[in-house]
Every structure is written in structure tokens, then in C-alpha cells.
UniProtKB/Swiss-Prot annotation:
Keywords of this entry: Calcium, Metal-binding, Methylation, Motor protein, Muscle protein, Myosin, Phosphoprotein, Repeat
Disulfides per UniProt: none
Pfam families in the cross-refs: EF-hand_6 (PF13405)
Organism: Oryctolagus cuniculus
Note: This chain binds one calcium ion.
Protein name as catalogued: Myosin regulatory light chain 11
GO molecular function terms noted in the UniProt entry: calcium ion binding
Superkingdom, natural source: Eukaryota
Subunit structure: Myosin is a hexamer of 2 heavy chains and 4 light chains.
């Protein structure tokens, strides 16, 4: 009986290890940090309330239950870290890196304006995950100055991240 259990466990581990082989250790660590930010109650599972709290932390209050339910239905069950990583792995297969990065910024832009408030982006970059230093923030604003309203064009940032040079602004 023990060999059967070992085989089942090995098969289960092999199934989940495939998703871990899709990413390098740095990427897995970044996904883990993102998971931890979203898992607001720190129970190891992302649920609807975690999503609601995450949206509230980003300034988006009154998210509709239907929207949260649709997000939760993308997973086949409870969203632990392995499921979270698998979901991103499936979404990123064959995806254009610029589209992926733009999509990440769009989550922070619920009105779809193509901009994010400088203050909000700076707060995220200096308090979450791989934190920016004050010098890195200064360099970023020099490269991507906000408009007079304090908004940052994230599409230009995405272009530079993926192509290495600013778009012609003509």
C-alpha cells in the first residue's frame, strides 16, 4: 500500500512541479510576493474578500460581487500559491511581454484612462515587493515625467520595458 501512496504523491508533485519549471527562481519569488500582497488575511488562500480588500487598498471601492465572482471562477477551486502560479503560467503562455505588462498596469487603472496617479505608483514601488530606492524613483520620474495633473502614462513605460527605448512622441 505504501508504494501506491508514494506513486500518487510523486504524480501529484510532478503535476505541480511543471508550473514551477515554467519560471525561474526570481520570477517565482516575485509571484510569491504578489500572492502575499493579495492574500490580505494571510491564510494561504486568495478568496473573494482578499480580492475586495486588495482593490480597496488600490483605491477601488465598491467592486461588484459579480466581478469578484468572475475572477474567482477562473480557478477550479481554492486559490493557493500553486494554483495562483498555474493560472499565471496559463495566461502567460505565448503572451506578448508588452501585453502582459500593460495588462498588469490596467489592473491599477480601472477607468481605462491609460494613466496612473504618480503618487499611487510611487507608493506601490516604494512599499511593495522589490522596493525602489529614492534614487530609482527620481530616475523613473526623470525618464517618465507625470503630466500636470500628476498622471503617469504607463503605456510608454511598458514600451520602454519591452523595447528598451522611448516611443517617438510625434
Amino acid at each position: 500500500m505504501a508504494p501506491k501512496k508514494a506513486k500518487r504523491r510523486a504524480a501529484a508533485e510532478g503535476g505541480s512541479s511543471n508550473v514551477f519549471s515554467m519560471f525561474d527562481q526570481t520570477q517565482i519569488q516575485e509571484f510569491k510576493e504578489a500572492f502575499t500582497v493579495i492574500d490580505q488575511n494571510r491564510d494561504g488562500i486568495i478568496d473573494k474578500e482578499d480580492l475586495r480588500d486588495t482593490f480597496a487598498a488600490m483605491g477601488r471601492l465598491n467592486v461588484k460581487n459579480e466581478e469578484l465572482d468572475a475572477m474567482m471562477k477562473e480557478a477550479s477551486g481554492p486559490i493557493n500559491f500553486t494554483v495562483f502560479l498555474t493560472m499565471f503560467g496559463e495566461k502567460l503562455k505565448g503572451a506578448d511581454p508588452e501585453d502582459v505588462i500593460t495588462g498588469a498596469f490596467k489592473v491599477l487603472d480601472p477607468e481605462g484612462k491609460g494613466t496612473i496617479k504618480k503618487q499611487f505608483l510611487e507608493e506601490l514601488l516604494t512599499t511593495q515587493c522589490d522596493r525602489f530606492s529614492q534614487e530609482e524613483i527620481k530616475n523613473m520620474w526623470a525618464a517618465f515625467p507625470p503630466d500636470v495633473g500628476g498622471n503617469v502614462d504607463y503605456k510608454n513605460i511598458c514600451y520602454v520595458i519591452t523595447h528598451g527605448d522611448a516611443k517617438d512622441q510625434e
